[in-house]
Amino acid sequence: MKKFYILVVVMIFQFAHAQDSERIKLDIIEIGQVLDAYHAAAAEGDWSTYFDLMSEDGVFLGTDASERWIKNEFRAYAGNRTGWVYRSVTRNINLTPDGMSAWFDEILDSLSYGTSRGTGVLIRTNEGWKISQYHLTFPIPNELARHVTDEIKAFEAGN
């Protein structure tokens, strides 16, 4: 009888673990869909959708060191602009153990800038996953880093 109870407990834990694994897979799919929709909305200049995908206290960090846009400031900046096109090439998504937050990194491609990287954080809300922070950067090959950073230093010294 004791073996039976142990077997039942083991089966319950396995079932719970399988459900957790399935939930994580579904969350990763949903987060990927949010990020894809975010990029699609930017490309179309659909600012209503774009900003609805951000949390109320969402922040966008741009490529310029001065660009730290809180959601409402960024909405005003975007205004009637036509948008920007970035296509995700690769993406990695991780969830916190409690499943309430996620972080990601993705390599992007655009006709304007070529390779870039997006990183950020999403939070689970009653309305689904929302982007709490998005950070766009230009990865610099190590062989070019010294030259590029020297150019940035010279630029900053001149301003």
What is each stretch, according to the model?
Residues 1-4, 19:
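Positively charged n-region of N-terminal signal peptides that target proteins for export
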Residues 4-13:
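Sec-dependent N-terminal signal peptides
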Residues 17-52, 150-159:
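Short, low-complexity N-terminal intrinsically disordered segments enriched in polar/charged residues
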Residues 42, 119-128, 152-154:
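Short beta-strand segments and strand-loop junctions that repeat across beta-rich extracellular domains
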Residues 56-68, 79-84:
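A short gly/proline-enriched turn/hairpin at secondary-structure junctions
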Residues 72-115:
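Surface-exposed, charged secondary-structure patches
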Residues 93-100, 122-130:
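A short, structured loop/turn motif at beta-sheet edges
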Residues 133-159:
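Low-complexity, intrinsically disordered terminal/linker segments enriched in charged
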